[in-house]
Amino acid sequence: MPRSLKKGPFVDDHLLKKVDVQNEKGTKHVIRTWSRRSTVIPDMLGHTIAVHDGRKHVPVFITEGMVGHKLGEFAPTRTFRGHVKEDRRSRRG
Protein backbone atom coordinates (compact mmCIF):
# COMPACT_ATOMS: atom_id res chain seq x y z
CA MET A 1 0.00 0.00 0.00
CA PRO A 2 1.49 3.39 -0.97
CA ARG A 3 2.19 6.17 1.48
CA SER A 4 -0.52 8.78 2.08
CA LEU A 5 -0.13 11.89 -0.08
CA LYS A 6 -0.78 14.20 2.87
CA LYS A 7 2.31 12.81 4.63
CA GLY A 8 4.71 13.30 1.72
CA PRO A 9 7.78 11.21 0.84
CA PHE A 10 9.95 9.77 3.61
CA VAL A 11 13.63 10.79 3.65
CA ASP A 12 15.90 10.30 6.66
CA ASP A 13 16.81 13.64 8.23
CA HIS A 14 20.57 13.06 8.16
CA LEU A 15 20.49 12.22 4.44
CA LEU A 16 18.31 15.22 3.58
CA LYS A 17 20.64 17.48 5.56
CA LYS A 18 23.70 16.24 3.62
CA VAL A 19 21.94 16.75 0.27
CA ASP A 20 20.82 20.27 1.24
CA VAL A 21 24.35 21.26 2.33
CA GLN A 22 25.80 20.07 -0.98
CA ASN A 23 23.08 21.88 -2.94
CA GLU A 24 23.88 25.13 -1.10
CA LYS A 25 27.62 24.78 -1.69
CA GLY A 26 27.18 23.56 -5.26
CA THR A 27 29.34 20.47 -4.72
CA LYS A 28 28.60 16.91 -5.85
CA HIS A 29 30.60 14.62 -3.54
CA VAL A 30 29.52 11.01 -3.00
CA ILE A 31 27.16 10.68 -0.03
CA ARG A 32 27.44 7.37 1.86
CA THR A 33 24.23 6.16 3.48
CA TRP A 34 22.72 3.09 5.11
CA SER A 35 19.21 4.48 4.60
CA ARG A 36 17.76 2.18 1.94
CA ARG A 37 14.25 3.18 3.05
CA SER A 38 14.56 6.82 1.97
CA THR A 39 12.59 7.97 -1.07
CA VAL A 40 14.39 9.70 -3.94
CA ILE A 41 13.23 13.32 -4.15
CA PRO A 42 13.93 15.96 -6.84
CA ASP A 43 16.51 17.70 -4.59
CA MET A 44 18.76 14.64 -5.02
CA LEU A 45 18.96 14.87 -8.83
CA GLY A 46 22.54 14.80 -10.10
CA HIS A 47 23.99 13.52 -6.83
CA THR A 48 25.77 10.20 -6.39
CA ILE A 49 24.59 8.38 -3.29
CA ALA A 50 26.46 5.27 -2.11
CA VAL A 51 23.74 2.94 -0.79
CA HIS A 52 24.72 0.10 1.55
CA ASP A 53 23.78 -3.38 0.33
CA GLY A 54 24.77 -5.23 3.49
CA ARG A 55 28.38 -5.74 2.43
CA LYS A 56 29.58 -2.60 0.65
CA HIS A 57 28.30 0.75 -0.58
CA VAL A 58 26.96 0.73 -4.16
CA PRO A 59 27.25 4.12 -5.92
CA VAL A 60 23.91 5.22 -7.41
CA PHE A 61 23.74 8.29 -9.69
CA ILE A 62 20.30 9.86 -9.24
CA THR A 63 18.36 10.64 -12.46
CA GLU A 64 14.81 11.86 -13.17
CA GLY A 65 13.40 8.36 -13.64
CA MET A 66 14.37 7.40 -10.08
CA VAL A 67 12.27 10.09 -8.37
CA GLY A 68 9.59 8.50 -6.19
CA HIS A 69 11.42 5.18 -5.79
CA LYS A 70 13.33 4.01 -2.71
CA LEU A 71 17.15 4.08 -2.63
CA GLY A 72 17.27 0.39 -1.74
CA GLU A 73 15.74 -0.54 -5.10
CA PHE A 74 18.97 0.44 -6.85
CA ALA A 75 21.38 -1.53 -4.65
CA PRO A 76 20.61 -5.27 -4.90
CA THR A 77 21.33 -7.26 -1.74
CA ARG A 78 21.52 -10.74 -3.24
CA THR A 79 24.00 -12.03 -5.81
CA PHE A 80 22.78 -14.67 -8.26
CA ARG A 81 25.64 -16.92 -9.32
CA GLY A 82 23.62 -19.07 -11.71
CA HIS A 83 22.42 -22.63 -11.56
CA VAL A 84 24.97 -25.43 -11.73
CA LYS A 85 25.14 -26.99 -15.18
CA GLU A 86 24.29 -30.68 -14.95
CA ASP A 87 27.04 -33.09 -16.03
CA ARG A 88 25.79 -35.48 -18.76
CA ARG A 89 28.28 -38.23 -17.86
CA SER A 90 26.94 -38.58 -14.32
CA ARG A 91 23.40 -39.27 -15.62
CA ARG A 92 23.14 -42.84 -16.80
CA GLY A 93 19.69 -44.11 -17.53
Swiss-Prot record:
Entry protein name: Small ribosomal subunit protein uS19
Keyword terms: Ribonucleoprotein, Ribosomal protein, RNA-binding, rRNA-binding
Any one Gene Ontology molecular-function term assigned to this protein's record: rRNA binding
One GO cellular component term noted in the UniProt record for this chain: cytoplasm
Source organism, top-level taxon: Bacteria
GO biological process: ribosomal small subunit assembly; translation
SUPFAM superfamilies in the record: Ribosomal protein S19 (SSF54570)
Organism: Parafrankia sp. (strain EAN1pec)
Entry keyword Ribosomal protein: yes
Family, per entry: Belongs to the universal ribosomal protein uS19 family.
Ranges annotated as spanning the membrane: none
InterPro entries: Ribosomal_uS19, Ribosomal_uS19_bac-type, Ribosomal_uS19_CS, Ribosomal_uS19_SF
Protein's job: Protein S19 forms a complex with S13 that binds strongly to the 16S ribosomal RNA.
